[in-house]
Regions:
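N-terminal alpha-helical interaction modules that lie
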Residues: 1-47, 144, 149-165
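Conserved positions within tetratricopeptide repeat
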Residues: 34, 81, 116, 123, ...
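Boundary/linker segments of alpha-helical solenoid repeat arrays
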Residues: 47-51, 94-98, 124-137
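Start-of-helix signal in alpha-solenoid helical-repeat scaffolds, especially tetratricopeptide repeats
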Residues: 7, 12-15, 54, 58-61, ...
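Alpha-helical adaptor scaffolds
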Residues: 26-97
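Alpha-helical linker/edge segments of TPR/alpha-solenoid repeat scaffolds
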Residues: 62-75, 108-118, 128-130, 138-164
Length: 165
């Protein structure tokens, strides 16, 4: 069965535009990259449901991830997190890069509880091989979890001391 030429043209257009916009990222032009990625996402969002192939949805995931990266570089972390959450919720719950970016963002905000939550989801849905691609993030969250656990143990020990007096 032949591929629908409209769908093939959409995929080609999306891929070409993504590649052009990726070049802006490589040059450090994050503002223009943001605009480019948002235009492509807008194009995809305006496609009819029957035009949304798995390949187009995969491109959407990658474009949203790249958009999140650009926004992170622009120090717009809160906005960047929304796109990573959209990827995990709506496109690919096994996309380890989004979990890693979210964990890192929450740790930067000193929100260890949210970082820990996304780390648990990452461990649930992603392969060990995928998780190992982000050693710095994993070391950081493991360290934060260990510190929090030690802090809680210290409080519990203090409670016991005061309760026994």
């Amino acid at each position: 069965m032949e591929e629908n030429p409209v769908k093939e043209n959409n995929l080609t257009y999306i891929t070409n535009e993504k590649n052009k916009t990726n070049e802006l990222i490589k040059k450090g032009n994050f503002e223009e990259a943001e605009k480019g990625y948002k235009e492509i996402i807008n194009f995809i969002n305006n496609l009819k449901k029957e035009e949304l192939t798995d390949d187009i949805l995969n491109q959407k995931k990658l474009i949203l991830s790249n958009l999140s990266h650009a926004l992170t570089k622009l120090n717009r972390i809160k906005e960047a997190k929304k796109f990573d959450i959209e990827i995990i919720r709506n496109l690919d719950k096994k996309f380890s890069k989004s979990y890693a970016r979210l964990i890192n963002a929450y740790l930067e905000e000193k929100n260890v509880a949210c970082a820990r939550y996304h780390y648990s989801l990452m461990k649930e849905y992603c392969s060990k091989e995928d998780i190992q691609k982000f050693p710095e993030v994993i070391n950081k969250i493991d360290h934060e979890i260990q510190e929090k656990d030690q802090f809680i143990q210290g409080i519990e020990a203090m409670k016991q001391i005061f309760l026994n007096k």
